[in-house]
Amino acid sequence: ALELAQGKKFARKAYCLQDGWLLTKPTPTKPADLSALQQALTQAGALDRPLVWCVLPLKNEALYDLEPAYFSDETGEANKQALTAALAQVGGLTVIDAEAPLVTGTLADREQYFYKTDFHWNARGAFAAAQEIARQLAGAGTIAETSVPQAEDFLWSELGGERRYQG
C-alpha cells in the first residue's frame, strides 16, 4: 500500500491502474506444471469417479480492456490453449469452459463480477460462473436441470446490492 501511496504503479507483482483497479501481469504457464496436473488428474481418474475440470478466466483476462499496453494479450490465450491441450490427454475427464459469462458483455458488465482491489471475482462473479458450470453439467446429463442455480435462489443484501445464496 505504501508503494501505491507514493504514486508507484507496480507493487508486489500487481499493477494499479489510474482508476484503482489492481491487475496482475499474466505469465506463461510452465510445461512442467501442466505435466504435473495431467499426472494428478490421471491418478484421480483411476478412482473410477466422475472427474470434471472447469476452465475459468483470471481477472485480467475478463477485464482485458483495462490491461496496460505492456501486458501481452496473447499470454492468457496461450495459457488456456496449453491447458486445454493438456486436459484433452486425460482420459475420462470432462472439461467445462465456463468463462463465457465473465468475458462477454460491456466492460461495465464485466467489472460487476470482480473486486476492484483484489485479484478474484466477487459473489456476483461466483454466481455467474457457478450457473454456467451447472448449466453445462445439466446439459451433459451429469446433474439434474433443477440443480442449476437461479437468481431467485439469492436475496438482495441491503449493502451494495450483492446477492447472497440462501440455499
Regions found by a protein language model. Name each.
Residues 1-167:
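Extracellular glycan-modifying ectodomains
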